[in-house]
Amino acid sequence: MSIVILGGNECMERRYMDLCQSYRCRAKVFIKPVGGLKKKLGDPDLTIFFTSTMSQKMVQSALRELESCDTVIERCHTSSLSALRSILEKHAG
C-alpha cells in the first residue's frame, strides 16, 4: 500500500516513515509546501492530512491535485505517532 503524508513535524518525518514501513506500506512525507505536488504525489492508495501543521493554502492545493486520483483521504488534527498508528490500523491493518 502506498501512503502520502502531508503536514506533520519535521523531527518526526523519519518516525512516520518507519511506522508505515512496519505496516508494510511505502510512505512519502511532505512536511513543507512543495511545488509540482501532482508529479511528486503519484497515485497513492491513502493520503493523510495532518491539518494542525498545514496551512489552509497547502490543504486546498493538495485537494485540487488529488481530485483526479482514486485515493482515500484521511484528515487528522494531531500529528502524533499514535494518531498515525490508528489511521494505519484502520486502513492497512
Language-model features: where?
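Short, charged N-terminal beta->alpha structural module
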Residues: 1-24
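Short glycine-/small-residue-rich Rossmann-like dinucleotide-binding loops
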Residues: 52-53
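An anion/phosphate-binding loop that grips the pyrophosphate of nucleotide cofactors and donors
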Residues: 44
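Ser/Thr/Gly-rich flexible loops in soluble cytosolic domains mediating phosphotransfer, phosphorylation
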Residues: 67-93
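A short, well-structured beta->alpha microelement
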Residues: 24-40
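Catalytic phosphate/metal-binding cores of nucleic-acid and nucleotide-processing enzymes, i.e., regions
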Residues: 8-10, 18, 41, 87-90
